[in-house]
Amino acid sequence: ATIASDAVRRLGGRTLVLTTTLRALRAIGDVMKQKLEGSGIEVLVQGEWPKRHLMERFREGTKAGEGGCVLVASATFWEGFDVPGDALQLVIIDKLPFPPPNDPLVEARSKRLEAQGRSPFNEYFVPEAVVALKQGAGRLIRTESDQGVLVLCDNRLVTTGYGRRLICALPPMRQL
C-alpha cells in the first residue's frame, strides 16, 4: 500500500486497486486513506458506499478541477466496470485471483477432477485465475487510445511455472 500510495500521488489518483479478499480490501483501503490524507485524492473503498456511487464518482475522475480517485475493490469490480479515458491509468492487483479453495462449489469441482485422476490445480484453479486476471487487467484498457500501467503484486508470477502461464495469457504489453 505504501508503494501504491506513492504512484497514486504521482498520477493524481486515477487508480483501481483490485483485491482478492475482503480482509485485504479493508487493510489496503485503511492504509491508502492514511497515506493520502490531505493530498486531495479521494480514496473510495468498496462497501463504504453503494457500488453505483463508487463507479460514478470514480468515472468523474479529475473533472471540474477535482482531484482524481483511488478505488479499492474486490470481486464485483474485477469485471463489468468500464472507465475509458484518463480517469483510470493504473490498476494494481494484490494477489493472483485463484478461486477460494474452501468454497463448496470449488471443493466439489476439485474432488470431481481428483476422482478422474486429473489435477484440480492445473485444470481448474490456474484456468480460473487466467480468466480473472484477464478481466482485472482489462479494466485498464477499454478503448484503442487508452493506456496505463498494470501492477501485479504477487511474486509467484515470476517464481513458478504457472506464473509464466498467467503472464502469457495477459494482453500484449511491455513488462518491466
Pin down the residues of each PLM region.
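ASCE RecA-like P-loop NTPase motor cores
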Residues: 1-176
